[in-house]
Amino acid sequence: MGGAAGVGFGGLVGHRGGGRDRRAGGGRRAPEGSVVTGVSTVRVAPDETDETADATFTSTRPLDYLPGILLLIGVGVLGKYAQIWWNALAKHEHWTVPDIEYVLWAIVIGLVITNTVGLHPIFRPGVLTYEFWLKAGIVALGSRFVLGDIAKLGGISLVQILVDMTIAGTIIIAVARWFGLSGKLGSLLAIGTSICGVSAIVAAKGAIRARNSDVSYAIAAILALGAVSLFVLPPLGHAIGLTDHEFGLWAGLSVDNTAETTATGYLYSEHAGKIAVLVKSTRNALIGFVVLGFALFWAGRGQADEIAPGVRAKAAFIWAKFPKFVLGFLVVSAIATAGWLTKGQTANLANVSKWAFLLTFAGVGLNTDIRQIARTGWRPLVVAVIGLTVVATVSLGIVLLTSRVFGWGVTT
């Protein structure tokens, strides 16, 4: 992403490597060893081990988060009321228009704020917590799943993911080479597009000793694709005639970042959103294995740190990269499956999940800076677009083949 673009009053602009932010007020420096994506500062230090891709908690003072969290709530609630207002207006005027879900309203409102007046720095710490709310929502969503269903669908989606990942990853690396991108940038784009978006890119950065510039380009490209997926895949799903279950599988297999995957699924329907979250969580669980594979490849070429020999060392590497919120999702599901939750408690957890996702969707919009993404070099973006097209096409073919030909995981 090289340099970054700021917006509005005091919008954040930064360089890689601790460059000085070009703001109206001037003088603020981005943290050393970080890049700026949208309105978020992402640590890409070589010793990065956290499974999250962005600095979710950027301040040690709790009150710093209050303005941004209130903004997330405000945008989310406004999106909900916008849906109600739109439906009432359409009914009153006798318009034949689709029901626009609150998910899209919240994202669009956030996009408009960030890309017009801009996001004031006072809101930034709280807005960046949207990834936390996403993970909290996924954990709470575990109460809606029975472990048997998770095992069945997870096993099916694992096969789909492995086939999709192998085909798409190979094509993306080949296309990146054809466009003259560095081998490691091609690896980052393949990892981000086929597994888990920004989280996977940051997890791989230190493991393969990728340059900060390569990480910046890959992150910007993935963020751009996430925004595109939100607006392209749901209409395509309706045009193709996908069931809620099929679309949830497709979104979970093809959309990169977990937040955008969740939003894309829920834009189609609540059931599609639940399936998308489950499939995406299965993809997330593979981060450690994929990063380990690329690390061993580059280490064999003398261009990455050696991974200590032995099964124990490799298991420790995989655990360090494993997204822990997936375990929380499974634990809550196990508790619900065992019958230890009353109907009231299950309903409360469902409400917690919905509210957490509402804040997440608002954060997706507020964290998408279109002008900054546009400043990314065209080649990584083109490769990423080709990658998204390949992943979406291959995954759609896999979903249709497994559901309509083989009848795997078909639900009524």
From Swiss-Prot:
High-level lineage: Bacteria, Bacillati, Actinomycetota, Actinomycetes, Mycobacteriales
GO cellular component, one term: plasma membrane
Family: Belongs to the UPF0324 family.
Membrane-spanning ranges: 67-89, 102-124, 128-147, 154-176, 186-208, 215-237, 275-297, 317-339, 349-368, 381-403
Region (Disordered): 14-34
Annotated keywords: Cell membrane, Membrane, Transmembrane, Transmembrane helix
Domain of life: Bacteria
Membrane topology type: Multi-pass membrane protein
Keyword Oxidoreductase annotated: no
Organism, scientific name: Mycolicibacterium paratuberculosis (strain ATCC BAA-968 / K-10) (Mycobacterium paratuberculosis)
Subcellular location: Cell membrane
Protein name: UPF0324 membrane protein MAP_2119
Pfam families from the UniProt entry: Cons_hypoth698 (PF03601)
Keyword Cell membrane: yes
